Amino acid sequence: MATKEQMEKVKDIVVKLRYLECMDNIIYYDRWNNCPKDGFDYEGKVGAYLTELSNEKLTSKETKELVESLEGETAFDSDTDKGMVRYLIGKYKEAVQIPASLQGELNQANADGQLAWGKCYEADDFESFKPVLKKQFDLQEKIATAINPDEKPYQVLVNRFDKDYRLEEIDAILAKIKDAVCEILNAVREEQSKIDDSILECEADHDTVLRIVKKAQEILRLDKDKSTLFEIHHPVCVCTGPRDSRPSTNCDELIHAILAVVHETGHGLYNYNANDEVAESGLWGGIEGAMHESQSRFYENHVGRTREFWENLYPYLQKEVPKYKEISLDTFLAALNKVKPGLIRLKADELTNTLHIIIRYEIEKEYFDGKLTVDTIEEAWNRKYQEYLGFTPKNHQEGILQDVHWASGCVGYFQGYALGDAYAAQFAHKLLADCPDAFEKLGKGDSSVIGNWLKEHIHQYGQTYSAREMLKKATGEELNTGYYIEYLKEKYLH
């Protein structure tokens, strides 16, 4: 049994590690939001120093002795205590395995990469981005080798985000989903092509878009005292404390801005909704990877694309954008949910989104298996887009430069979106079993049934459990992709 004294020490270390992470996330937020270009380099150095401080804490004699005394322990007073120990052991092992100099180099590369990506994207210049990409991938491979030299580098990188899965499992899950998506796509492509989605295009000024996306957040009951909205080309959500989560959107296109803010609000709600015990223990913020993406994808698709959600938002949209007064809600929803294969992941329809994810996962895997280089990666990208979606990018912006992930160090992350879709469908199935009137109430303006169910069964626990444990605790089952496939069939074939 872990002693009270041991757990007090664990809590002290974990909480202080989260302080440092919080400061690093504030820098990350600033780089997205306010930092002038000439400030990026210095902020990168500050971030590297915070990593150094974190490593010093993790590799100290005190932490080493504490971890050694608790490793293998199975008896704890609470699940929160067990979660803190698991968290600390995981962080300790990485700190011991990865030299501080290498981690600092990666932090600087992430800052530099984010800035370089922005410049190269604006210039549509992949050639200048190649050295940045190669440096990132080289550093990621060094990180993977440092963590486990006996494992495939890509397996290690994927497990930094989705710790519960072997590549073989992910391959099988994605293959099953891909087959189902392609089958549905082939069945509906012709009929869906007849839907006029040009109505989604509209001239709306910046302030109008901002008012509408804030109204969407209001419907979802995002707490203004625990969040703030910022604007960015590539929407993200930054968690800077247990009661401080900062979703974003891109206000260039109205409907895209709404869906993006609903997606990021899902992250935001998960980030700040840990219960007090979990928050005070340093386990706030949610489980990264697929579990976090399940919450954003749940809100984007299972809420944000539904009639019930738009019964609340559409009248406001019609008031702010007069053209929609002439368009029925039925017509609007058909356009919103139209299956329309395309090149841009962030603008993908719900059905084909997974194909975008699979392309990225396959490319990462092939690169780290030695089958691709930075000189051949774009050709592979374009070939897969033509094969899976029927389009070849005409430029780099709508092709390989569209995502910021690789530039900012998120390598091995993409499978989390697809797994997150499967998790989200499983959560939706259980939510409806527990609360059959949840969406009826949403249609009447009350999203609290949905929000409270997610908080009670998932959000309040933060990082207390692993993703697989959390899924089983919330739904009573292991991952069952059948729920996701049936959801897609019900939506598009019936």
Language-model-detected regions and their locations in the chain:
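Acidic/polar loop patches that form or flank catalytic/metal-binding clefts of enzymes
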Residues: 225, 277-281, 305-315, 374-375, ...
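Secondary-structure capping and boundary motifs in well-ordered enzyme cores
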Residues: 42, 105, 132-135, 173, ...
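Contiguous, non-catalytic segments that form substrate-binding/exosite surfaces or channel walls
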Residues: 107-256
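A well-structured
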Residues: 2-163, 489-493
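C-terminal, non-catalytic "cap/extension" segments appended to globular domains
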Residues: 2-6, 22-25, 38, 59, ...
